[in-house]
Amino acid sequence: LTICLVATVNVQAEEGLSVDLNSGRGGEAQRVDDGTEFKVCADQDNLPYSNNKMEGFENKIAEVLAKDLGKKLTYQFWYDRMGFLRNTLNAKRCDVVMGTTPDNDALRTSKPYYRSGHVFVYKKDSGLKITNWDSPDLKKSVIGIVGQSPATIPLNDHGLLGNARPYRMQRDLNLPPSYLVDDVIKGDIDVAVVWGPIGGYFAKQSKVPLEVVMIPEYENENVKGKEFWNISVGVRKADKERIAMIQGALDRNKDKIEQILNEYGIPHVPVVEGDNLMKTYRKGKTQSQEKRGDAIPKTE
């Protein structure tokens, strides 16, 4: 059972933080967009991306965009899991999703504004030296990995399933977003294989020094194990003018956005134009015909 809580938080783009929490109610009047708001659909407890204290890097990037556009930044919060878009963007409770793949069929998207990949995270004093899937130290380590994530493909291809401790794709809301990196710190696992923004941010927050190593791209070996993805802003399909406006703000604030990513420890590499999920899927179908592989796993 998934329990979704909804709240609205108003954030003044230029005058600091003003918070007004209201419970969502059935039969509520549909919001009318008067053009003065930059209203973001976000998770209230999903660092490093967002939370209701405005501490996430997507919160900070949204502040930059709202200020550039001269709009009041507001939020509609909903846990980011099944039904997120249905209950937020598509219900017109908000207008902008700060992080999605650029060819998400449910959205109209901006050009990608950053690109990240999966990382290895391990203690600096562990004596381990891990740079890729063939590293000898990886073969003697307990590896924490999110089940069904793309990184499980190279893990399997390199005969490392016996080393794996799988974690659920959908986080238990009783656990903090840092739970996988926390298990490295506690010594429950030796290495975490995790999406870059999660690994980089929580490693930077850790009092225990951690090593963060970007995993080499695996797409050419097995497209289903693709490690790197472009990330865009998304709006409703019909919102052509809104996404054009947002694109202008993204273009004008590239340096500020990169600074935010760096401050949060988000591993990132140059955007690869034209890299998208459907291209990967088509390539995967070709490889499957040749190798009789399985379907592309869900991304994290």
Predicted regions, residues:
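Bacterial N-terminal signal peptides
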Residues: 1-7
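Alpha-to-beta junction loops
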Residues: 71-72, 90-99, 140-142, 179-180, ...
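Ligand-binding clefts/hinges and TM-proximal coupling segments of bilobed small-molecule sensing domains
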Residues: 14-23, 30, 150-171, 244-300
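Extracytoplasmic small-molecule ligand-binding "clamshell" domains
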Residues: 15-105, 173-174, 263-264
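Acidic, polar ligand-binding/catalytic clefts
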Residues: 18, 63, 67, 72-138, ...
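Bilobed "Venus flytrap"/periplasmic-binding protein-like clamshell domains
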Residues: 44-48, 52-67, 120-176, 191, ...
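Extended ligand-binding regions for polar small-molecule ligands
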Residues: 14-23, 29, 56-68, 126, ...
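Periplasmic-binding protein-like
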Residues: 43-44, 115-127, 204-250, 267-292, ...
